[in-house]
């Protein structure tokens, strides 16, 4: 044993192949010392069981000298235990290369190289590699890729918009859904799908400063997107020449950006594929002048290919403001406001005719004439079929009209009236007496709306004099919570100080378990607070949130909402109710509103309830009414004549009813149909729910965790705790937290427990783990004993896995046409391929592991035979590879040609189809076909099977 090792010999570590070639330094008693020059590491091993494999190359192998030149081996000589290789260099000159001068950086990654170098992996790893290939192949072809992994209930109109927009090259669209319909989720889905498919690599998100945190939370929690939040401090402190270039996704406040010219210059220079602008209706534009914010976004939109604008509904904004948004998307198409107004009027009668067809199932003579005038001679046959009662013809007619709709491809707008599934609301007001302590408070911003804040600001008071000792709203809250025991209650107040004080009050005065949630807490602390509230068995009954702290959070598992105070703007009121009032809420929303009489709180309640009707219904006119009546409203909240107050409320109510009637009459059902997807979105919902019910992912992940040394243990129903074990294989495994993480595969659980990771095929942990398997050599060699009575002992079968590989930009999405599915070959001694007769799973059940030393010994003895069979296997599988590539080219060409024909025909009737979109698709077709032509067959893995 001692003579097996000689100083200067080259060996490779079985457990740390990344160290490169090792050199024997010394053998001292029972210890062996090995230097790994590539990394500078030294290891000592026990002589008895050193995990090392001797590096021996054979004639035909190509090896590398430490100076970089290569040698093709012709002859191998053993001189005193050291290998000397003779052969030809790159200039075909005879040279000699002693093993002591081999490159230290040689790593055996190719399956055949590793097999013959004795680097044989556990049997389970080979199965893991095969299954990883199969799952990757299935996912990249899935129509749900980028849509199914969002931590949200799948909703038809959101999925339809996301797929329609994200599947375009450099989409430029306006998302103008009514409040509560999920514009942020739609934008997140578009971003996520574009990133996963490679259509976009760098995304810029511009938002108002007060929405930055909400976007950060939404992108991270729902989509696992790590967004870099930029502000003046981060920008100044960065050492990079351009701080934006380091961020794949940047979140920037527009208010800061317009004030900082250096940041603007850096932003323009960074290069982006997609820009998302939230609250785009605040960008002010008039025909003769534009605001600084509008001009900045306009300049960015001229250099960034893809643009998503999130905005209020067109009816809320008015036509001129709506035109200003469309002008940002396509200034060539929308260049003349007067022409746009005329075009909009042109479409209105058509939309009304469609409304009639939908409501009545038939067309009146007037509606018939309107549509005939719009479609011309092409539509006569279709209209005749509709008149005969053909329902399929009606559907085709609506599709034809949708295709011709002036803004149908650039504007998506859903309304609550068109979308089903929202809960009802019930209002419970509680007028309470004004405490004496609040009657003479010092003046301040909204001091009497939030008297507890003004009271506390007067200075330190004893514990017995704190505001929550005398404020009747606190007594009412304690009584209400006791009455609603075992029912989850969300309490929202305007200020973080109030939220923290209320937690103290409940703990001291009632012992009711409460969780608090405010902007002073870290995201992790908020997650824990939300999880404590969500826990049905041991969690808090009540969660007390501040206004800002609750932004972007979903608490729809609760249906009781207490507004401890009222916000100063109707949009904030709607945001509060929106924490619970979402599609999928199973209960009637119970709104509990305590307010202090004889002051601003009482009048603000009356304003929201009687003037705006904002408690029982969404208030799309709230912002416009606040803008119109705000200057008169604010002074009257503080006091004033009751008759004048009643008159103001009545006037505002009348104006609201007038605006709502305008909104209703202006509804464009044609646009709503296009935005809702006319059934296509529902099919996506059903596919996602079906995928959720499958067990393929949990089964696969358990094998992945086992292979990488990740321990999993039960946390609770549908939840697991993952922790790195002492035998963790790779520290780069994307666990997310070195201490451990809690996961669930259940969507419902993930929606109520935001502290848990929601694992889907799209999750970074899943994708990162799969990448670690396929990007390295893990599992690409194995040797096993096969127990089968039909096989004579000693019979050798060779199982080969090949992959058709195409190297191309991800944006071409060639994986959809040529996925990395394993091409499997199972060769017997005569070179016959048995793969079609023996399935992978069937074969797996008959296999047993072989000790590595025995496996290596067998492989070395059979090296020449196995090498010959591997070459024969490649020849066997090549025709299948050629056919797969040809089929991929046929599918790509057919899909691209169909879409090109559709867009070209559409452009003839709808000017919203951009030439650049058609040109990009045509180029993508050409590039994709050219790249597929270069697809190569690669040996992915080898398994040697010996009958026993």
Curated annotation (Swiss-Prot):
PROSITE patterns: HELICASE_ATP_BIND_1, HELICASE_CTER
Gene3D superfamilies, per the entry: 2.30.30.140, 2.30.30.930, 3.30.360.80, 6.10.140.1500, 6.10.140.2230, P-loop containing nucleotide triphosphate hydrolases, Tandem AAA-ATPase domain
InterPro entries linked to this entry: Helicase_ATP-bd, Helicase_C-like, Helicase_RapA, P-loop_NTPase, RapA_C, SNF2-like_sf, SNF2/RAD54-like_C, SNF2_N
Molecular function terms, GO-annotated: ATP binding; DNA binding; helicase activity; hydrolase activity, acting on acid anhydrides
GO biological process assignments: regulation of DNA-templated transcription
UniProt domain Helicase ATP-binding: residue ranges: 164-332
Alphabetized UniProt keyword annotations: Activator, ATP-binding, DNA-binding, Helicase, Hydrolase, Nucleotide-binding, Transcription, Transcription regulation
SUPFAM superfamilies reported in the protein's UniProt record: P-loop containing nucleoside triphosphate hydrolases (SSF52540)
Top EC group: hydrolase
This enzyme's EC code(s): 3.6.4.-
Domain of life: Bacteria
Keyword field contains Ubl conjugation: no
Chain span(s) of sequence motif DEAH box: 278-281
Family listed: Belongs to the SNF2/RAD54 helicase family. RapA subfamily.
Function statement: Transcription regulator that activates transcription by stimulating RNA polymerase (RNAP) recycling in case of stress conditions such as supercoiled DNA or high salt concentrations. Probably acts by releasing the RNAP, when it is trapped or immobilized on tightly supercoiled DNA. Does not activate transcription on linear DNA. Probably not involved in DNA repair.
Subunit text: Interacts with the RNAP. Has a higher affinity for the core RNAP than for the holoenzyme. Its ATPase activity is stimulated by binding to RNAP.
Descriptive protein name: RNA polymerase-associated protein RapA
Gene name of the encoded protein: rapA
